[in-house]
Amino acid sequence: MKDMPTWIDEYHKGSRFGLNGKVLLKKNSKYQEILIIETDFYGKALMLDGCWMTSVRDEKYYHECLVHPALSSIDKKSHILIIGGGDGGTARECLKYSQVSKIDLVEIDEEVIKVSKTFLKEIGGGAWSDKRLAIHIDDGVKWVETTKDNSYDVIFIDCSDPSEFSNLLFTDSFYKECKRILTKKGILATQSESPESFENIHIHILKSLNKIFKLSETMYSFVPIYPSGIWSWTFASDEELNLSKVNYKEVMEIENNCDVWNLNFQNAAFKMMPNKIVKKLNS
């Protein structure tokens, strides 16, 4: 299997998405099975417990959409928390902003970071050696629960789909704790699953954030290797959430360093909520 190209599939609710390639690494960590695959089209890719997580070719569709709507619109962004994010892509995008002075990246599975540093160097880029990034191998829920009030300007939840060790990252109690440790005008940004392949979880996340925060907005775009291809990211705040109010000079500089995100892309993506989701949120 490690020498010959083969089709490697993710199975989800009677469907599957396969990539042709060679397995470069297969190992079990304390939490999950980890595969690194050299795919024919998407380059090196990370698979966790049989689910595609990211690839060198398509990762920016995910990471740029998670990070830039929040960081381009908030004035104070010096202290950032990333829950998960072991591939380094979210940290890389955050570090494009000179105002960011400290990032705490809390990843429960150290092996994900190790294999990403070795095999997915294009994704983490220079983030791993940036002095502003502090890596903590810890449980994200416990980290948030033990953090002082008003500690972070932005929190990014960059986690995998709900599982035995990540379910608590999708609960009301966790979102309330995140709210507590945000600064007054802070923003919570989270991947909020697919409105197609994970509709029930998606609805749960949006309803929870609508209930816990005064303001929330959801954007939709595509991540090619994820189930159904369509994905979402939700942003929430209690004081201010004007995601189109940006520093245009700064945005132009960021846009020039992005492959997917720009302000026009973002503005359109926030208007793409499927009507079935609208109706279920209002029911």
From Swiss-Prot:
Family matches, as PANTHER family: SPERMIDINE SYNTHASE, SPERMIDINE/SPERMINE SYNTHASE
Keyword ATP-binding: no
Enzymatic reactions: S-adenosyl 3-(methylsulfanyl)propylamine + putrescine = S-methyl-5'-thioadenosine + spermidine + H(+)
Subunit structure: Homodimer or homotetramer.
Pathway: Amine and polyamine biosynthesis; spermidine biosynthesis; spermidine from putrescine: step 1/1
Superkingdom in the source lineage: Bacteria
UniProt name for this protein: Polyamine aminopropyltransferase
Predominant location: cytoplasm
Pfam families the record matches: Spermine_synt_N, Spermine_synth
SUPFAM superfamilies according to UniProt: S-adenosyl-L-methionine-dependent methyltransferases (SSF53335)
GO cellular component, one term: cytoplasm
UniProt-recorded Gene Ontology molecular function terms: spermidine synthase activity
Keywords: Cytoplasm, Polyamine biosynthesis, Spermidine biosynthesis, Transferase
The enzyme's E.C. designation: 2.5.1.16
Annotated active site: 158 (proton acceptor)
Species name: Prochlorococcus marinus subsp. pastoris (strain CCMP1986 / NIES-2087 / MED4)
